[in-house]
Amino acid sequence: MTARRSSFEDEAVDYAAVGATQRSDLMQYPPEGYVPSEDEFRLGSGEERFALATSALLTWGLHRSSGVEITDVHPGTGVQYGGIAFAEDGTPLEPIETHEEQRFAEDGTPFITPGTTVVFAGSVGGEPLVGPHRVISVTEEPGHVSLAIGTMDGDPESGEQSFTIEQREDDSVWIVVRSFFRPTKGAAKLVGSKRRRKTMNDAYLRALLPSRGL
């Protein structure tokens, strides 16, 4: 695997603290001006449940089951941010790229790759979710798979959200949703609010339940 530096000027996100949803202290020290959130929900247990949940996450199944239409998809190159250090104000320092090869689900659906850009249209839990987004990172480790997505210019809110599927020591499988958002200029104050995020997170958390067919 080769790492190289880049400015990431093409298809850039509209916020500075790229990757901050992966920080353990996000809830205590969110990027300045942003509202953080974190919720988790148990999906079941076992290897099969973990595999089904992670496959759904990495093929947009989570979003589609939550009521979001995925449009204008431009696959990424597999390049993602890695090894990010943060300043005290949450600004990332010296981002490094890593390259990941394209992978596919059992049914042949391509997995989401870092750098992919999409436009969301629809609603989650009755809350509108629209606008352009970029996949910041995809992490696959034993018992831990995560997807981080950031907003781009033209979105009514600015920030990042990560979705993590975990298989814990007791074999239980969980989804963890973390984010930080604020409304963009001219957007309604409700956008980026704690109530809106809680409503949306609850819908995301339940979208992967076995009863939903995933």
Predicted regions and their residues:
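A conserved amphipathic terminal alpha-helix motif
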Residues: 5, 9, 181-214
